[in-house]
Structures are given as C-alpha cells and as structure tokens.
Amino acid sequence: MDQDAFILKEDSEVEREAPGGRESLSDVIGFLDAVLSSEPTDIGGDRSWLHNTINTPQGPGSAHRAKSEGEGEVSTPSTQDNRSGEESRVSGRTSKPEAEAHAGNLDKQNIHRAFGGRTGTNSVSQDLGDGGDSGILENPPNERGYPRSGIEDENREMAAHPDKRGEDQAEGLPEEVRGSTSLPDEGEGGASNNGRSMEPGSSHSARVTGVLVIPSPELEEAVLRRNKRRPTNSGSKPLTPATVPGTRSPPLNRYNSTGSPPGKPPSTQDEHINSGDTPAVRVKDRKPPIGTRSVSDCPANGRSIHPGLETDSTKKGIGENTSSMKEMATLLTSLGVIQSAQEFESSRDASYVFARRALKSANYAEMTFNVCGLILSAEKSSARKVDENKQLLKQIQESVESFRDTYKRFSEYQKEQNSLLMSNLSTLHIITDRGGKTDNTDSLTRSPSVFAKSKENKTKATRFDPSMETLEDMKYKPDLIREDEFRDEIRNPVYQERDTEPRASNASRLLPSKEKPTMHSLRLVIESSPLSRAEKAAYVKSLSKCKTDQEVKAVMELVEEDIESLTN
C-alpha cells in the first residue's frame, strides 16, 4: 500500500512537470522502471552513491528541475534516492544552488510532507531510518580514502586484468572521488539527519549494489561499465603498486592519511586529467572505516613499497659479510678464543658454524634463525661441559674418600708400630738401666740393674753334730751365736747389692739366685730373740722402714745389744 502511494505521488509530480515543457518524459520513465524493479525490502541497502556526484554530459539534467522547483516538493532524483536504498548523490554540474536544493530534497520533514498521512508501519520513511537507530558514522563513507570494496567476482576479474584501469582512463570513464564531503546541512530539518540517517542498521544488500538510477540511459551504461571494471578488495588483498606492476599508481594526496579538509576533496592526477566533463561515481566501502589510510598503503606481506632499496641494502650486506667475518676472526684471535683466523673459518664446531652463517645472513629472518642456533649450540656445549665437570668432581670426590680410608688405615698401623716400639724401648730401658738412683753417681762404671752372683763351688752340707762344738772352728756355729766379725762376710746384702767383682757380666742376671734376700731372715731373728713382744714389734717396724743398708745395720746392732744385755 505504501509502494502504491509512493508511485501515485510520483505520477502526480510527473504530470505537473510535463506541461512545463522543460524536460522530456524519457528520463523519468527510465527512472521509474528502476524504481519498480526494486523490492521494498531493499530500501535499507547500501547508499554510498548518495555522496557521489555524477556529471551528466547532456545539457539540462533532472537536477535543473530540482533547482526550479520549490523546497516543499520532492524532486524526481531525490525520490528515487529514497526508494532505491543506495547512498548515491546524483546531480548535474555542482553549484551552490544545486547543493541547497538537494539538501532540501533530502529533508526528512519534506519527505513526510510529500507522502502525506498515507504511510503505515512499513512506510518508506520508517525504512529510511529515524536518525537515531541508524548505524551511519558521523563522517561520510570513505571520506578518508579507504580502498573501495565490491563483489568478489569483480575483484577477481580486475586482479586477472590489471590493465582495465588504464583503459577506463583512456576511454574517459569516471574516476572515483576520494574523500568527498557529506551533504550540506542547510535545511532546517536536515541538520539532524544530513542525508545520512536514511541508511538503517540492516545488512548490506549485494543485489542492489550495482543499480544506479540516473536520468540518462547513456550515462547509466557508462557507469555500469565503469563499476564492472573497477578493482575491488572485498575478498582479496588491496591492489598496491607493489602487487600490480603494470599499473601506474597515482601519488597519494597529503590528506589521504588524515582525512580530507571540508569543502576540498583530494583528487589524483588522473582525476585532474578527466575532471572536465567526465562523470564520476563512487561506491560505498563495505568495510567500516577504521584506523588511518596509511594501513591500506602497506602491502600484506609487510615489505616496503620500494623493494629496490631493500634489494640494494641486501646486496650491500652480502658484500660486507666477508669483512665482518674477517673482523670477527681477528677479534676472536686477539681475545685468545681461537689460535688463528683459519680455525674460525674451518672449524666444524656447531657454535662456529652458526656464527659464520649468522655473519653471512642475507636478511633478518635468516640471521635470527642462525643466532638462535648459535645460542642453542652454545647452551648445549655449556651443558655438556658442566656434565663433564660434574663427572670429574665425582671422580675426585671418590679419590679423596679412598685417600681418607688409606690414611686412616696407615694411621692405625703407625699407632701399632709406635706402641710396639715404645714397648721395646721400655724393655730395653729395664734391661740396660736401673729404675732407682745410686748413691755413687760419680762412678763412671756401669752398674747393672740386676746382679747375679758368680757360680761358686758349693760345699756339701754336713749334718750338725754336737761333737762339732768341741772343734775350734766356728764355721758350723749357729748364726745366733756367731760373732759379729763374721757378719761382714754376708754375701747377700739387703737393699743395695754391691758388686765387689766387676767381672760379672750382664747375662749373669739370667742365672737363678740360690740365696734369697735376708730381710725375712732378719725378721725371724728378731722374733726368735728373748726380747719382749713390744720390743720385737718395735724392731720389726723400724726394720721395715729402713731405706738403706746403714739403717738396717744400725737396727740390727741395737737388737744384738739388747739380746746381749738380756743374756748376760
């Protein structure tokens, strides 16, 4: 119902324009055919053509009608702009009155006034957007000069035939206008919309992309032919001077990287050549404008636009690597790492091999690879040396432990030897020297510690007979009644054994002595004497305290005196 109301409104406008006689109906009929060929659901499609200017090569165009009509009426091109669902601004030769008329035609309030109250919930004005629900950016599409996008088939065709751009320029076909400005905000109702709120947030319709509504069939064919041959980048890499060598790239304007200034859209050299009467058209980029223009200027592989500089620098680096190797070899030789430069060039070690390859690298990727190999080989060599050092330290530790065991056993053996030696020395000291001190320390003669009497001829013991007392000989008298002069002849001293015969040898001590010491005999003499018990105990005690022979002699003299006094 809304579509019929739209068409009836357009027919009434055509009837009013026909009596004027200023324009033929052929342009309007072609325009209506394009309107009827589109579906109402395609109204919210791409409207990038709203911001493009088509210079009609004919004399008076449909835009001249819009100039003569009032601001309250909707002209034929503006109505078609609203119905086609594409943002393509179609006008004649641009001028300030035409821009004002076009801005007035796109006013949203005028569109509602032209439709009247016959629109429903699916009306064209609602499909065109209300200004707040649309996804239009504040800057007009492609104002910063992004690469144009299109159908993938056109992209592949243009990639296969890169010479079509030059053919279009030779045929005088329109060139795309980079960084064009938006619609002027000169209407009262257009300040909020600016002609851009008519693009809703719906998905892009690829079927309506190539449809351009123009007042001239010849211009339509030229624009369609131009759009078909135009390079696109919707599904492939952007065409750059590095990827398309056959096409001469126009130099970029200085406003392409930061956006064009208002009122002065940048243009290329080819646009200056064809800017006379050549129509220009621009298709909206399907990609949202992000970043800056400098991103699309660089190829995808990251290389420079001028590969000649890198090639020259690479060749220069290849020429310099020989001198670098010589300098490195000289440095290693001076540091003492290697013996000579020939060793660095001919060494088969992994570190030296990667070092030579790193110095001979032609680019940074190869150099990075070789440097990584050098680091890993050096790390592996260091780890191997660390393992060798660990094994060596382990062997040294085992050797030290074995040395400790050997030293411990040797110490024990040495202690045993020392103990045996000391026992032998003590035995020898007992053999060769006396334990106590002698009185005559001045004597130079050596006195043995053990004295053995020389062997004597023993007299046969005769049994005592009382008849012997009759003999004059006192030899057989008992000791108790023997005279004192015979006591000096006792050959067995008590404490100090004097050797009256120095001829006695040192081995005589080994001979058993047949005569015992007389200390026990002296005690028996005292106990058998007629003295009292107290005197006997006193003499025995004093005898046990004697230290020398003189003391023993003095004690025995006292004992004898007491006995004599008692007997007498």
Curated annotation (Swiss-Prot):
Residues 7-20, 83-101, 150-168 have a biased composition (Basic and acidic residues). SUPFAM superfamilies: Multimerization domain of the phosphoprotein from sendai virus, Phosphoprotein XD domain. Keywords: Chaperone, Coiled coil, Phosphoprotein, Viral RNA replication. Residues 344-411 are annotated as: Multimerization. Residues 50-59, 191-206 have a biased composition (Polar residues). Residues 1-23, 38-320, 496-516 are annotated as: Disordered. Residues 33-41 are annotated as: N0 binding. Residues 364-429 form a coiled coil. The keyword DNA repair does not apply. The modification Phosphoserine is found at residues 68, 125, 192, 249, 257, 260, 447, 449. InterPro entries: Paramyxo_PProtein_C, PProtein_oligomer_dom1, RNA_pol_Pprot-P_XD_paramyxovir. Phosphorylated by PKC/PRKCZ, and other unknown kinases. Phosphorylation is necessary for viral transcription and replication. The N-terminus contains the majority of phosphorylated sites. Ser-249 is the major site of phosphorylation, but is not necessary for most functions. Residues 412-445 are annotated as: L protein binding. Residues 479-568 are annotated as: Interaction with the nucleocapsid (N-RNA). GO terms for molecular function: RNA binding; RNA-directed RNA polymerase activity. It comes from the Viruses. Homotetramer. Interacts (via multimerization domain) with polymerase L; this interaction forms the polymerase complex. Interacts (via N-terminus) with N0; this interaction allows P to chaperon N0 before encapsidation and form the N-P complex. Interacts (via C-terminus) with N-RNA template; this interaction positions the polymerase on the template. Essential cofactor of the RNA polymerase L that plays a central role in the transcription and replication by forming the polymerase complex with RNA polymerase L and recruiting L to the genomic N-RNA template for RNA synthesis. Also plays a central role in the encapsidation of nascent RNA chains by forming the encapsidation complex with the nucleocapsid protein N (N-P complex). Acts as a chaperone for newly synthesized free N protein, so-called N0, allowing encapsidation of nascent RNA chains during replication. The N-terminus consists of a long intrinsically disordered tail. The central part contains the coiled-coil multimerization domain (PMD). Forms a four-stranded coiled coil structure. The C-terminus constitutes the alpha-helical domain that binds to the nucleocapsid (N-RNA complex). This is Phosphoprotein. It comes from Sendai virus (strain Z) (SeV). The lineage of its organism: Viruses, Riboviria, Orthornavirae, Negarnaviricota, Haploviricotina.
